[in-house]
């Protein structure tokens, strides 16, 4: 049987991290229609037209991406002087004063063009410098005109040429996050049963360092669109994840990078910029719990004085022992670019046991099995047999509504569509997302919305429904495993907060007491099977327990989790909140307080409700959507607030 089918890649998953902010933006009114027209009879039409063309394969290749034009990153300098960011985030203000409106923020290590001289020094000893395209940054604590500053050379901005902006890894065993290279004796004192751990690691090293092809192995064009049948070598961009060395997979330039200059001699030549503050004499700043997702920018091996261990460098310039983390690559799954030959309506297979059917004389007959997350063009017809709805493919087979998610034209159009503007449509029932330019669909994919489906979002993990606009966009930020974020309109629960201070908090009045947002734990009904480690993370971390049940103020049987400095928990847990952090969750776009579109590198069940309220996208899809929506993040910036200064946010319509 030859079905009108587009093969889409299914893969496995991962973990990560996030902290952002919400800037005010109004929601435009529009009417949303049902995903499919009413069942008017045995051959009722699916809403919308269809080309009926058989489509080619949109394969996930072991390739990397070309840099989409206009992406944030180091801004081209030309002959202009530059301003370098020396704190983890530096706020961009509309006017040269720290009480002015916040337009966005920059990330450590970034260099952006600046005015030749400061425009003023009110409240800023180093002076306020104008940067492009708008705004002012204070030189001093957060930024410098000295481009030889050690921290600028030590840090590394996100890589936006690939689907994931950093290398990522998950914590396999509780670990200290060192601020300098520890000696052997210091490691034995800081890490429980270290000798036993190292013995186990050396016996299992090949297995625990193994990776699969992932998001950064997908070939994408200059717009971030997946390229069919293109492999990494064909694009001339280097090696695949499975060909890279262990050091490369942890963010290193090579597999044998030396100890960085700022860590030579067992000392630290740059300040600690992490959210866990130290007094200068400590050897580590906080601990990371099992399943924590880390973003990495480098790696190096040590000599016998440090047990010969390799250390990875986190994005906030802390060190983690490589024996206690496992690199991962995110899901290579992605959606489809649409064109005249491939357009709506489409059906994505959401069940791993799906089959096609024939309907003969009103009786349903089983035909061939269907590939999980493959996509099929539909001819606009549907039938209902014994209470089950079936959709007709363009090559005259039937698909059960129980097995697929539909991407179809809406019954009614929002005003932005009528005016030819960009807008996003998300169906919670179908778990699909479509990018529209006016009434032309340009991209379609599967997503994971809230676990609670169509329940009331105010009292559950359901995704909010309605019409919204993108409020702010972040290249990456930190979340906890309940996907609470200090910049998402809810109280921060996992430490940090610098990103929220930088982006602003215009939605405190709208914050809900319970955190919606995507989680690493899914309880929804699903045909999809979460990959290995993710299945464990879904149940939370049961491997670590509080050191004491009884502390002052504790109710009978209640465990009090320390707010800071606990040897086992550090600042990574709060009562009633997530148990581990997901650092630098990529491509976050908030459209409502506590609700965002973002990449999820910790799971691979897209097409199944999974989150705590956010809309999870595969990394390749999140990258594509992020650089398609408005407002664009200016070159060199890490986040931007939508509004009259930086541009109106793209419309987002979420419906059943």
Regions found by a protein language model. Give the residues of each.
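Boundary regions of SH3-family modules and the immediately adjacent low-complexity/disordered segments
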Residues: 32, 37, 50, 58-83, ...
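SH3/SH3-like (including bacterial SH3b) beta-barrel domains
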Residues: 94-110, 277-292, 359-372
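C-terminal motif of bacterial Sec signal peptides marking the signal peptidase cleavage site
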Residues: 26-29
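Intrinsically disordered, low-complexity acidic Ser/Thr-rich regulatory segments
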Residues: 73-75, 226-302, 541-584
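A structural motif detector for short, solvent-exposed N-terminal "entry" segments of globular domains
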Residues: 409-455
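Extracytoplasmic
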Residues: 78-80, 87-89, 126-128, 291, ...
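Exported/periplasmic cell-wall-interacting domains
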Residues: 417-419, 452, 457-465, 480-656
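Bacterial N-terminal signal peptides that target proteins for export
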Residues: 2-17
